[in-house]
Amino acid sequence: MGAADGPVHLPTEYSHYEGAVARTFDLPLLILAQDNLMRRVVFDPNFGPYMGKFPENAGKQWLNGKDFKVAFGHWREAMGNRRDFFLGYCGAAAKTARQLRDFLEKQLDATVLDWQRDFKYSRSIIEEIEEARVRCSAGIFLFTKDDLMSKPDSGRQAAPRDNVVFEAGYFCAAKDKKRVLIIRELGAKMPADLGGDIYASLDDRRNLTVVKQSLRKFVSGF
C-alpha cells in the first residue's frame, strides 16, 4: 500500500487469531509492532497490553533499547503475577487449606493464589476473585461443613460457606468445569449444579491422604 510517508504494512491474519486466543484465555501478551504496520485489531493501541514499537531495520541492539525493555517489563510483571491454581475455602477450614497449599507448592511444585495469604485488604473480595480468574489457570475449592442446616438430610448435616460455592461456580463458568476441582468433606452438602465428576471426597479434613492422588491427577493436566 502506498502513502505519502511510505508504505503501510498489514500483519498476517495469524497474529490476530493467536492474539485473540491468548486474550480469551487471559494470557499475558507481549505485543511488538513494526513501524508503518497498520494499527488494527491486535495491533490497535486499545487492544489491551502495552505495545512496543520497532523500526523495520531493527537489529539485535534494539533489544537493549527503551522500547523493548518497557514492553518486556510490562509482560514480565504480568507473567510474574500468574499462578497455577486459586485456592478457595472458608476461614474455618484454614488449617486444612494450609496443608493442601503446602502439598501443592512443596510436593507438586505448583504455584498457588491463597485468598487468606495473598489477597489485598484494600480491595473488595469480588475484585480479588475477578483478578484471580485472570491470574490463575484453574481453581481448587474446599467444600467443608461450615453452616449447619435447619433440617439436615441423613449424612449431610452442613453446607459449605455460600461464598466458596459462589467462587467455585464462577470459576466453572469462567474457566470450564475441567479447570475446577472441588474437595468435598464427608457430610457437606453438594449443590446439584456442581455435582458430577469434578470433586474428590475428603473423609477427614485433618488428613489429606485420601485426596492426594486426585490432586496429582488434576495438577498433571496443567
What is each stretch, according to the model?
Residues 1-20, 117-173:
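TIR-domain catalytic/interaction hotspot
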Residues 11, 32-34, 89, 142, ...:
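Short His-Asn-centered micro-motif
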Residues 23-53, 175-187:
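Gly/Pro- and small hydrophobic-enriched strand-loop and loop-to-helix capping segments
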Residues 25-29, 108, 136-138, 176-179, ...:
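Short glycine-/polar-rich loops that comprise or flank the Walker A/P-loop
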Residues 32, 115-117, 183, 202:
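Conserved beta-strand termini and adjacent loop/short-helix elements that scaffold enzyme active sites
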Residues 37-38, 120, 148, 190:
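Positions that flank functional sites
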Residues 38-98, 189-222:
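C-terminal interaction surface of TIR/SEFIR-family domains
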Residues 74-141, 174, 186:
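Conserved N-terminal substructure of TIR/SEFIR domains
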